[in-house]
Amino acid sequence: EIRYLGLEFGIGSYKTNPPNKVFEQRYGDCKDKSLLMVKMLEELDIKAYPMLVNSTLKNTILELPPSPEFFDHCVVKVVDNNDNLMYFDPTLSEQSGTYKNRHFPNYEYGLVVDKTIKSFDTIISNSDNTVYIYEEYDIKDLKGKATLNVKTTYTDVEADRMRYVIKNTAKTSFHNELENFYAQYHNNVRMRKNPVIEDNKDINELIIKEF
């Protein structure tokens, strides 16, 4: 694992560390991780290039004069043997899915770091990024108790985010958060049993079933 750590001062703000150093120290910023990924892919005879983006400007960057100051992030562009284009952000964690459907943020435009390149790549995100919630109420009568079953399906980046939350939250705290959410809408809500989590990593889908 190469941790994402940026030391944004001095020459380190612009110059990458050698890939061997990044691999040995096990950390690096966005440009360090991107260059390392590019070199590793090149060793496998896969065409790859570092690419500069701006995480917030989107298409506004097309209207600005050329300047390195307008880029705040570095990612990777990959060209496979069939000339298909793919984009990867090595700084993202807890990602699942295959290399063909790995989530890539909607940066919209990116500039490949290559002296022969003079125009932007147009980037179209292929991620679904949805949350589907299915709630099933079982009401015996209007005065008695009722039960609620909930199935929430997270896809693409939403699955990545929830995977990160689950990994970095104590189990008891996570269960309490789920229960407290529905306590905002229903009185005397109690979880009947622990939630069931299904992580379908091949398609980057995470399902939480609550009872």
Please describe what each predicted stretch is.
Residues E1-F211:
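A sensor for short, sequence-defined functional sites
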